[in-house]
Regions:
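A short beta-loop-alpha structural element at the N-terminal edge
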Residues: 4-16
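Conserved GNAT-fold acetyl-CoA-binding loop/helix
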Residues: 24-43
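A short helix-loop-beta-strand connector motif used in the catalytic cores of GNAT acetyltransferases and
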Residues: 44-56, 83
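Conserved beta-strand in the GNAT
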Residues: 56, 62-71
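Glycine-rich acyl-CoA binding loop
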Residues: 57, 95-100
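A short, internal acetyl-CoA/4′-phosphopantetheine-binding micro-motif in the GNAT/acyltransferase core
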Residues: 87-94
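Conserved active-site alpha-helix within GNAT-family acetyltransferase domains
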Residues: 100, 104, 123-141
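Conserved GNAT acetyl-CoA-binding A-motif
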Residues: 110-120
Length: 151
């Protein structure tokens, strides 16, 4: 199995939309966004690649998943951090090492540019949690708060 990672192109929109709908299927998320909101991350990755990185994951040339990574400054580490907004791998490609290869790709791409990789994982996602812990991720004790509205 040949795994390839590449940045989004406009031609990826339909395939991204197919996969992002699966990513946001309950019970994996707390809130199910509209189609427009789901596609906004794809558009942001094309429009603002310095802040939002859209990455297609391919296996032997076939779409196998995608990732959305946001770049932000974090005072705690005194530098830039990559926030894994979404990391999705289709069912047929899970447990084949793609997650580990993705993080190796990301580390190579962002070497010397970031000081932290940050992500969220739900309690129900035991497989992902094991992967992240094996890669050295640790839980933070923070409880996050948000306010959603158009400012």
């Amino acid at each position: 199995m040949n795994i390839n990672f590449r940045y989004f192109t406009p031609d990826d929109r339909a395939e991204f939309f197919r996969m992002v709908k699966k990513f946001y299927a309950p019970p994996a998320v707390l809130h199910f966004p509209s189609d427009e909101v789901m596609l906004s991350s794809f558009d942001a990755a094309l429009d603002m690649p310095e802040l939002v990185k859209g990455i297609m994951i391919e296996s032997d040339g076939n779409p196998a998943g995608y990732a959305i990574v946001s770049m932000k400054f974090e005072t705690e580490v005194g530098g830039m951090a990559a926030w894994i907004e979404e990391l999705y791998v289709d069912d047929d490609y899970r447990s084949k090492g793609i997650g580990s290869k993705f993080f190796a790709f990301l580390a190579d791409e962002l070497q010397g540019k970031i000081k932290r990789i940050r992500l969220e994982v739900g309690d129900e996602n035991g497989g992902a949690k094991k992967l992240y812990e094996r890669l050295g991720f640790e839980f933070l004790d923070y409880k996050q708060m948000v306010i959603d509205k158009d400012f």
